[in-house]
Regions:
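Glycine-rich, phosphate-binding/catalytic loops in enzymes
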Residues: 62-63, 106, 209-211, 268
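An alpha-helical support segment within catalytic cores of ATP-dependent transferases
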Residues: 3-19, 120-175, 180, 185-187, ...
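Activation segment
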Residues: 51, 95, 191, 199-201, ...
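Active-site activation/catalytic loop segments of kinase-like enzymes and analogous catalytic loops
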Residues: 205-232, 244-263, 272-280
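Start-of-helix signal in alpha-solenoid helical-repeat scaffolds, especially tetratricopeptide repeats
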Residues: 237, 241-244
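ATP-binding pocket architecture of kinase catalytic cores
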Residues: 26-129, 149, 167
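Amphipathic alpha-helical coiled-coil segments
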Residues: 277-290
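Active-site acidic catalytic loop and adjacent metal/ATP-binding pocket
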Residues: 32-38, 45-46, 159-206
């Protein structure tokens, strides 16, 4: 049974139907299998996590996050989460994925969603960014990888940046606020924020930095819209710091995925992905000192 046949069978079982059909696979992410499925005239998404996804996501925490964020009306309705396997069935949102648009033209809509999240009383756990990075580095070492000297030096520099921004107030954050996780409804007036598995208490600029996955210029543009003025040196440094951190995190995730065989399984060179993110992290760290 291939993954599409499996998903059809699971949706039929969960929805007590026999007419589930695959509509399409959704792109995005580095290894998950997420499909749009239709049954009884209604569309859903079904997610099957990729190999070793459990290393990076606590599914019980994801379920708790979903229950919390439902109060804001920003996410799609989740019908089912299997906390052991990480499989998830949710209602499909008709609209346009932000990454497929002129992203900056929707900054006002995006800022409104961010400020709704950041000013809320949602109760999330501490995101614990550097604890996560420590874990990611350890996973790589356990697979026989030795971080090169250039990485160690950059990590030390990142630790120094962290100390400089230690007093920032933590607020509820999505922590994966990249345009592929945002959907604009068909009227163009409402933004849905999807995939809350990484949500936690964090610096609100961390969410803005996530826009860098679509190009760091997008994060800079969103920052200006968020603060409603030309960003100060301190504000820019916070953004550069968080994006540098994210790039090092992606570096380790990509190295791990290559070491467990996902480069071959998914026909994606994760070593090249790792190099891309490391080079970006180094560039951001170098520019940080000039701000």
């Amino acid at each position: 049974m291939n993954v599409e046949e499996y998903i059809v069978a699971r949706v039929n079982a969960l929805m007590h139907t026999e007419d589930a059909v695959i509509v399409k696979r959704l792109e995005g992410g580095m290894s998950n299998y997420t499909y749009v499925v239709e049954t009884r005239g209604k569309r859903y998404t079904y997610r099957v996590p990729g190999k070793y996804a459990e290393k990076f996501v606590d599914r019980v925490e994801e379920w708790d996050n979903i229950q919390e964020v439902n109060r804001l009306g920003l996410n799609n309705a989740t019908s089912y989460v299997e906390v052991i396997s990480g499989e998830k069935l949710a209602e499909y949102v008709e609209g346009t994925i932000m990454s497929e648009t002129d992203i900056e033209s929707y900054n006002e809509l995006s800022v409104a969603a961010l400020k709704c999240i950041h000013s809320s009383d949602l109760r999330f756990k501490d995101y614990n960014a550097f604890g996560r990075l420590d874990d990611d580095e350890r996973y790589c070492r356990e697979m026989g990888f030795t971080h090169p000297k250039a990485y160690v030096e950059l990590r030390h520099k990142l630790d120094a940046m962290r100390a400089a921004h230690a007093d920032v107030k933590m607020v509820p954050c999505h922590c994966d606020y990249q345009p592929t996780n945002l959907v604009i409804d068909e009227k163009g007036t409402k933004l849905y924020v999807l995939d809350w598995e990484f949500a936690g208490m964090n610096d609100p600029f961390y969410d803005i930095a996530c826009y860098g996955n679509a190009g760091f210029d997008k994060a800079l543009s969103l920052l200006k819209a968020y603060v409603c003025h030309e960003p100060t040196s301190e504000e820019l440094k916070r953004l550069y710091f968080h994006r540098c951190f994210q790039c090092l995190q992606w570096f380790n995730v990509a190295i791990f995925k290559d070491r467990v065989g996902l480069s071959k399984d998914l026909n994606m060179d994760f070593n090249n992905v790792a190099t891309f993110f490391f080079d970006m992290a180094k560039d951001l760290a170098d520019k940080y000192d000039t701000l």
